[in-house]
From Swiss-Prot:
<dbReference type="GO" id="GO:0005886">
    <property type="term" value="C:plasma membrane"/>
</dbReference>
<keyword id="KW-1003">Cell membrane</keyword>
<protein>
    <recommendedName>
        <fullName>Uncharacterized protein in glgB 5'region</fullName>
    </recommendedName>
</protein>
<comment type="similarity">
    <text>To cation A.eutrophus efflux system protein CzcD.</text>
</comment>
<dbReference type="InterPro" id="IPR027469">
    <property type="entry name" value="Cation_efflux_TMD_sf"/>
</dbReference>
<keyword id="KW-1133">Transmembrane helix</keyword>
<keyword id="KW-0472">Membrane</keyword>
<feature type="transmembrane region" description="Helical">
    <location>
        <begin position="24"/>
        <end position="44"/>
    </location>
</feature>
<keyword id="KW-0812">Transmembrane</keyword>
Length: 57
């Protein structure tokens, strides 16, 4: 019998999914942090540019 060219592995994707969820949460928390910083900075400095930029995040 001839050897096959493809070797299929059906491994569970739990580790990959957990890593992806962790990366998603870190990204979400960083975005929320910078949004809050821009809102506070915009209110303190009366900067409409910072406030509008924070609203677009």
């Amino acid at each position: 019998m001839a050897p096959t060219l493809y070797d299929f592995h059906h491994l569970p994707h739990v580790k990959t999914q957990n890593e992806s969820k962790k990366a998603l949460w870190v990204t979400l928390l960083l975005t929320m942090f910078f949004t809050a910083v821009e809102i506070i900075g915009g209110l303190i400095s009366n900067s409409l540019a910072l406030l509008s930029d924070s609203a677009h995040m």
